[in-house]
Amino acid sequence: MSSSSSTSPRFGSMISAKLASPPPSLLLPPSPRLQGRRLTPPSCTPGTPAALPSPGPDKEPEREAAGSGSGSATTPRSPAQLGSSQLHRWSRARAHRSGRRLEWPTIRDRGSGGASSPPTPTRPHPSSDEAASAAAKVAVEEEDGYGVVGRDEAAKSIYMVSDGTGWTAEHSVNAALGQFEHCLVDRGCAVNTHLFNGIDDMDRLIEIVKQAAKEGALVLYTLADPSMAEATKKACELWGVPSNDILRPTIEAIASHIGVAPSGIPRSSPSRKGQLTEDYFRRIEAIDFTIKQDDGAQPQNLNRAHIVLVGVSRTGKTPLSIYLAQKGYKVANVPIVMGVNLPKSLFEIDQDKIFGLTINPVVLQAIRKARAKTLGFHGQKSNYAEMEHVRGELDHANQIFAQHPIWPVIEVTGKAIEETAAVVVRIFHDRKQKCAMPRISKRVAPIRIYDYLSEMVNTHVEYQKIFARDF
């Protein structure tokens, strides 16, 4: 492999020429597709008071009573501040992924009162149902589109540059930002991310670097072409832009390990078009199969599925199925409905491929209410989103799971689709003993033990959790 010192001098001269005589319209605006994406509460904006969610009619007397005692208005706490740490994490993570806001005060807002400020009245610690309902309400409001904010001028910008789709750069940056979740939300560190994909010529590359210099952005790039990657590095150095090559260290490490030089051909290169691999066609076939098997359709084909998901309505069976299908797994999902028997073919197939999904009833009720509102029958008489019906369906599902202890049951409350999919894939491969990926720790004949735990709330069995632990 060639080192950075042996890069062709023509790229250095091209960069110098571009920087010496820039065209009049050289600055490139941020990508409109990702413009305005932010990972911070709106209270971080200087001089902008934090917006508060509209209170319900049952909350107004409580706020008036709290404010009349001290003679001054007090800022009510957001529902997102209530509940357990797991539910807090769920709400924050959803805000991060969607680029929407959470009504959380920053350190400046919390500490601006000073010594003379009257103490804020404290509210009693909510019950588990109230906490779950509050966090679920925040997540549902975000999903419905409330609280979408524009671009934060005070935010730090991160530019992601790729010569392909940008999938690697985007997911790498999102994974890294997860390590700063405590700052992005709790401490008000504003971050904007902008994706520039399909960058395959020097002109566009220089435009992006100059725009990054103007905004003081960090440039992270995944460029397969070594000359483009080196040119990006030099351009960032000339313009004083902090940068990092995400892809190159990994490529060099693999090349050194296997003793083969990389091709250096970007995915978007015409020379690579038309080279569709067997894995590609297998993924397309899996997606086609999964779509046809959605929501219990064509139960006669369950034996052809790699994975079968069962659970009550709105436990995320369909999005999880599609996500797994994009990884090449043929997935079928079967709904559990009270009064409707499960298809006979479900019990005739290999039971090792069946996975159950369960969820907290309070969160499920909030999701169903949002679903009913979307479908337009929110005000109509229906037990679809009533708590008694929700509890009954989950109890019915738990009875089915108890009758089939070989089915792993995964708790999906507050989990992203990627997290649930990772659990499913890990159990699937461990059972089939087909995992081709090397394990971090060497294990011999993995033994899987399932612990059944039930949580009692108001004398009702809310849900059963099954934890898979490796020994």
Curated annotation (Swiss-Prot):
Keyword Transferase assigned: yes
Known catalytic reactions: N(tele)-phospho-L-histidyl/L-threonyl-[pyruvate, phosphate dikinase] + ADP = N(tele)-phospho-L-histidyl/O-phospho-L-threonyl-[pyruvate, phosphate dikinase] + AMP + H(+); N(tele)-phospho-L-histidyl/O-phospho-L-threonyl-[pyruvate, phosphate dikinase] + phosphate + H(+) = N(tele)-phospho-L-histidyl/L-threonyl-[pyruvate, phosphate dikinase] + diphosphate
Skewed-composition ranges (Pro residues): 21-32
Main location: plastid
Chain segment of the transit peptide: 1-49
Cited Pfam families: Kinase-PPPase
Regulation: Regulated by light/dark exposure.
Bias (Polar residues): 71-88
EC class name: transferase
Basic residues bias (residue ranges): 89-99
Residues reported to bind ADP: 171-178
Localization, UniProt: Plastid, Chloroplast
UniProt biased composition (Basic and acidic residues): 100-111
Protein name, per record: Probable pyruvate, phosphate dikinase regulatory protein, chloroplastic
The organism of origin for this protein: Oryza sativa subsp. japonica (Rice)
Gene assigned in the entry: PDRP1
